[in-house]
Swiss-Prot record:
Primary role: Necessary for efficient RNA polymerase transcription elongation past template-encoded arresting sites. The arresting sites in DNA have the property of trapping a certain fraction of elongating RNA polymerases that pass through, resulting in locked ternary complexes. Cleavage of the nascent transcript by cleavage factors such as GreA or GreB allows the resumption of elongation from the new 3'terminus. GreA releases sequences of 2 to 3 nucleotides.
Alphabetical list of SUPFAM superfamilies matching this protein: FKBP-like, GreA transcript cleavage protein, N-terminal domain
Family: Belongs to the GreA/GreB family.
Keyword Transcription regulation: yes
GO BP field: DNA-templated transcription elongation; regulation of DNA-templated transcription elongation
Classification lineage: Bacteria, Thermotogati, Thermotogota, Thermotogae, Thermotogales
InterPro entries cross-referenced by the UniProt entry: GreA/GreB_C_sf (IPR036953), TF_GreA/GreB_CS (IPR018151), Tscrpt_elong_fac_GreA (IPR006359), Tscrpt_elong_fac_GreA/B (IPR028624), Tscrpt_elong_fac_GreA/B_C (IPR001437), Tscrpt_elong_fac_GreA/B_fam (IPR023459), Tscrpt_elong_fac_GreA/B_N (IPR022691), Tscrpt_elong_fac_GreA/B_N_sf (IPR036805)
HAMAP family reported in the protein's UniProt record: GreA_GreB
Signal peptide limits: none
GO molecular function terms attached to this record: DNA binding; RNA polymerase binding
Protein name: Transcription elongation factor GreA
Gene field: greA
Coiled coil segments of this chain: 1-32
Pfam families on file: GreA_GreB, GreA_GreB_N
Amino acid sequence: MKKVRLTREGYEKLKQELEELKRKFMYEISERIKEARELGDLSENSEYEAAKNEQGRVGSRIMEIEQILSNAEIIEDSEEGDEVTLGKWVTIRNLDTGEEHKFRIVTPQEADFFAQKLSADSPLGKSLLGRKVGDIVKVKAPGGVQRYQVVEVTNR
C-alpha cells in the first residue's frame, strides 16, 4: 500500500480512535454478545444480531485505521510562508460576497468540515494548493463559479 500522508494532529487522532475502538471491541461489544447469548435462541435474537453487526463494523474500522497508521507519513509543519501547502491554515475571501473563511488544508482521511479541515483533494483544496497570499482562484460550484482570494497563510 502506498504511503498515507497525515498531519501530526491527524495521526494522533487516529491513534486515539484506534485505542477507543479496541477497548470497545474487547469489552463492551464482547459483553453485549455474551449477554445476548444468555437470552436463548440466537435465530430470533435481535440484541445478538445487533451486537454481532457492530462487532463486524468496529473490527473493520480497526483494521482500516491500523493499515492507515502503518503506512502513515507524517507531514510536519513547514516553514512560515505565504504558499498554501498541506497542513497550512488558509484564510480566503469570497470575492462576490466578501465573506471570509479559514480552514486547514489536510488529507482526505482528516477532512472535517465542522472542524475547519478542508481536503486537499476537494475542488477548492486542489485550486488552493501552491497558491500564495493575494492569488485569486476560481472554483466550480453547483451555483456557478466562485472566486476566492487568498488572504492569509499560516502554520497555526
